[in-house]
A protein has these predicted regions:
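STAS-typified acidic loop motif
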Residues: 3-31, 50
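Amphipathic alpha-helical interaction surfaces in cytosolic regulatory modules
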Residues: 23-99
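Residues at or immediately preceding the N-termini of alpha-helices
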Residues: 26, 106-107
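Acidic phosphotransfer microenvironment of two-component signaling modules
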Residues: 85, 107-108
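Short acidic-hydrophobic, aromatic-tinged amphipathic segments that line or gate anion-handling sites
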Residues: 101-105
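A short, charged, amphipathic alpha-helix used as a generic interaction element across diverse proteins
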Residues: 114-115
Length: 115
């Protein structure tokens, strides 16, 4: 799985998978993010950039929920930015739109994490 990790100036770790998050790669995504959680305390927030994704399956959703809990345990913030209407539908159907900080605009997500 191709994933870009970028540490932004504001203490934000941006994690951007370049392919859909499915059973084929959700475990790899989860492991990579868990490894980034071991980084120094200079990181205070995480941004999952899903703008290249068109689809999430149940394994992808499970990974997101697990990582959300892990990030919360560390008293850090998580925002998710996406563009796909299909992904929005998944978040709404699973009611994750009530649990997660979701954005369809990259700048809004960054602003939320920078506050």
């Amino acid at each position: 799985m191709q994933i870009e990790l970028s540490e932004l100036d504001e203490g934000i770790m941006e994690i951007r998978p370049r392919e859909n998050l499915t059973a084929a790669n959700a475990a790899e995504f989860k492991i990579l993010v868990q490894e980034s959680l071991q980084k120094p305390d200079s990181l205070r927030s995480y941004l999952f950039n899903f703008t290249d994704l068109d689809f999430l399956d149940s394994s992808g959703i499970s990974s997101i929920v697990y990582l959300h809990r892990q990030i919360n345990k560390l008293n850090k913030s998580l925002a998710i930015v996406y563009e796909s209407d299909q992904i929005e539908e998944v978040f709404v159907l699973t009611k994750l739109n009530k649990l997660l900080n979701l954005f369809q605009d990259y700048e809004e997500a960054l602003e939320e994490l920078s506050d």
